Structures are given as C-alpha cells and as structure tokens.
Regions:
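Conserved tyrosine-mediated DNA breakage-rejoining catalytic core shared by Y-recombinases
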Residues: 1-6, 37-79
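Basic, Lys/Arg- and aromatic-enriched nucleic-acid-binding interface segment
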Residues: 1-32
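Short basic/aromatic active-site micro-motif
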Residues: 14-19, 101-106, 124-147, 161
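C-terminal catalytic core of tyrosine-transesterase DNA break-rejoin enzymes
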Residues: 22, 26, 31-33, 135-163, ...
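Short, polar N-cap/turn motifs at the start of nucleic acid-interacting alpha helices
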Residues: 42-50, 150-171
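Catalytic-site neighborhood detector that most strongly recognizes the C-terminal catalytic loop/helix
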Residues: 57-63, 100, 159-186
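C-terminal catalytic core of Y-nucleophile DNA break-rejoin enzymes
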Residues: 59-79, 89-115, 132
Length: 191
C-alpha cells in the first residue's frame, strides 16, 4: 500500500504502518492511546543478552509497567530512529507529527482496515469475529505460547503484557491448536 502511494482520507500510507504492525506483534502492548500511541523515545531502552526493547508503559490499562519485547521489535525501533533521525526524547515513536494521539490512532486504524479489506481478512475464519488492531496483541501472546512450545512462563508473559494468567487462559489460550508438545507436557512426570 505504501509502495503504490495509497492515500486514505488525505493521509499517505507509509512504511510506518508496516513497522507498527510488526511492533505490535512483537511487543505485547495494547494498541491504545495510553499504551502503543503514548510510547515516546524516552520510554524505550535497547537491551542486550537477550536482545530486546525495554518499554516503559506509563498509563496502561493496568497502570505503570515495564515490558520486554521480542528481538524483532529492536529492528523495527532502529528503522523508526532512522526514519525520524532528528527525534527528541519526548517525541512519540509512531506518527510523532500528530500530537493528538486519538488522531494518530484513527489514522492507523483506517489504514489497517483498508489492508484487511484488500486481503479479505476482515473476519477470523474460526471465530467469525472481526479482526482489528487489538487482534495483533492476541497474535503476539498466542505466538509466544506456541513458539515456546508451551514452555513460556505464563505468569511472566501475563505480567509483561499487563494482563493476568486468567485473562490469557480465558481469551487467548482457548484458541490455541493442540500439539504434540502439549501432549508431551501433559503426560510428563517432571525431570
């Protein structure tokens, strides 16, 4: 969409949409004005060993927290820093030219909806529910559980995502596919 010069309601679609979608799927943050759209450069620290971003979420749904990302979020942040090379510590990392964060959020939501429409992905084929940016938070949490083959510490994942183990069980884990690793985990007697 960015390569074709698409304009939605007077705003050009740029590579920033791609980076924001990747960031969401590798950071566990909520796509809200108090989480994703409120992150400033001062709230981001690049960590090593393991490679990650350490995000300070100041006014998230569950209050203040620090959160680790997956390694892929680091390269996204590096591209953001290159794109806005003259950034200041107090600048927002996404759509920094829009001080009104509700406006920034709506711009991305419109672009994301157009992407879903173009790819005929408006609805989840299994649940029948409408896809939205928030779906990418679900994807991030579920990918972590699946890719760890069930070995991720669910309490740690919940704390990092600013949610609870109960919420993960009720809204995320119930949609996960069964796997051989899950069966081995269920049948194990410890090591």
């Amino acid at each position: 969409m960015a390569n074709e010069g698409l304009v939605i309601r007077g705003i050009s679609v740029t590579e920033e949409l791609y980076d924001l979608l990747l960031f969401l799927t590798h950071s566990f943050v909520r796509p809200t004005t108090t989480e994703l759209y409120s992150i400033k450069h001062i709230d981001v620290t690049v960590g090593e060993n393991p490679k990650r971003l350490i995000l300070t979420i100041r006014k998230g749904k569950t209050g203040y927290r620090t959160s680790n990302t997956m390694p892929a979020a680091v390269s996204v942040y590096e591209r953001i820093c290159e794109r806005y090379s003259n950034f200041q510590a107090e600048d927002y990392i996404f759509l920094p030219n829009y001080q009104n964060r509700t406006t920034a959020s709506k711009i991305i939501q419109r672009q994301f909806n157009e992407l879903l429409n173009r790819e005929s992905l408006e609805l989840d084929p299994q649940t029948g529910k409408k896809h939205m940016l928030y779906s990418l938070r679900h994807t991030a949490i579920c990918m972590r559980i699946i890719n760890s083959e069930g070995k991720v510490n669910i309490f740690n994942l919940a704390k990092n995502a600013g949610t609870s183990v109960d919420q993960i069980e009720r809204f995320y884990a119930k949609y996960l596919p069964l796997s051989a690793e899950m069966a081995r985990n269920l049948q194990s007697f410890g090591e």
